[in-house]
């Protein structure tokens, strides 16, 4: 399952490499950051082995705790969802 993180800026004091590394730690064996483009990170969640909702919740929690801006969204199945909703 593909999930996209749309953001306008990174949290203060974090580089893109920091965020990618931390997300890969959060996802552990349930997914991986697999690319992206300007202001977007692409994640591949392993829906065959684990309920993808757990990984989605872990990503959302990480983004909140890392201090991503209020307008950051997760795109899942073509729908964008705010991380603070």
Question: Which residues make up each language-model segment?
Answer:
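A structural detector for beta-sheet-dominated domains
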Residues: 6-8, 44-46, 77
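Conserved short beta-strand edge segments in small beta-sheet-based binding/regulatory domains
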Residues: 60-84
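Structural alpha-beta junctions
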Residues: 25-34, 64-70
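Short, solvent-exposed polar/charged micro-motifs at secondary-structure junctions
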Residues: 42-45, 81-85
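Short amphipathic alpha-helix segments
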Residues: 10-31
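Broad gene-expression machinery/nucleic-acid interaction feature
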Residues: 2, 40-42, 71
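Short glycine-/aliphatic-rich beta-strand segments at the starts of folded cytosolic domains
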Residues: 1-13
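Short, intrinsically disordered low-complexity segments
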Residues: 30-62
């Amino acid at each position: 399952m593909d999930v996209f993180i749309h953001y306008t800026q990174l949290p203060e004091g974090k580089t893109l490499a920091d965020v990618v590394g931390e997300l890969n730690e959060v996802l552990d064996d349930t997914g991986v950051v697999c690319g992206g483009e300007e202001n977007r990170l692409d994640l591949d969640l392993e829906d065959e082995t684990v309920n993808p909702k757990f990984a989605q919740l872990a990503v959302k929690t990480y983004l909140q705790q890392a201090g991503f801006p209020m307008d950051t969204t997760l795109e899942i199945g073509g729908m964008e969802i705010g991380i603070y909703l």
